[in-house]
């Protein structure tokens, strides 16, 4: 989790931000989807809203993180994919306090140099996360209100090809 904090600090210091969904040209796409990425979620989250991240895992991956945050404050969902351990850690940070980490997954879906599609569905009680169309895990909301969750941050051993 310390690595994620360092990435967040770097993003803030470089003043990186964008609002995905407004990309217009391939050249702008590449610039806006560079990793580490920090983008706004217009209107915040609400039940029924879905975030889709398409990308390719790096050739020699270590880990990557996808985080949904309330600006630079609370972390509603931190999803840390670790390749050596073949695990996906999930957690939330509310008022600078990390909660209990969740690890259980039915399978590890990510493969070096292979494309993937992650869908994060915001439902009333939880986030439902699918990878390549298959349900991977649920993560029950620890941050409220949902519309305060207005930022997505992505970092690590991946290339982002599409985000909406």
Curated annotation (Swiss-Prot):
Pfam families: Gal-bind_lectin
Keywords tagged on the record: Lectin
Domain of life: Eukaryota
InterPro entries found in the cross-reference section: ConA-like_dom_sf, Galectin-like, Galectin_CRD
Any one GO molecular-function label of the UniProt entry: carbohydrate binding
Residues in Galectin domain copies: 36-160
Functional description taken from the UniProt entry: Does not bind lactose, and may not bind carbohydrates.
PANTHER family cross-referenced by the UniProt entry: GALECTIN, GALECTIN-RELATED PROTEIN
Protein name: Galectin-related protein
Organism the protein comes from: Danio rerio
Name of the coding gene: lgalsl
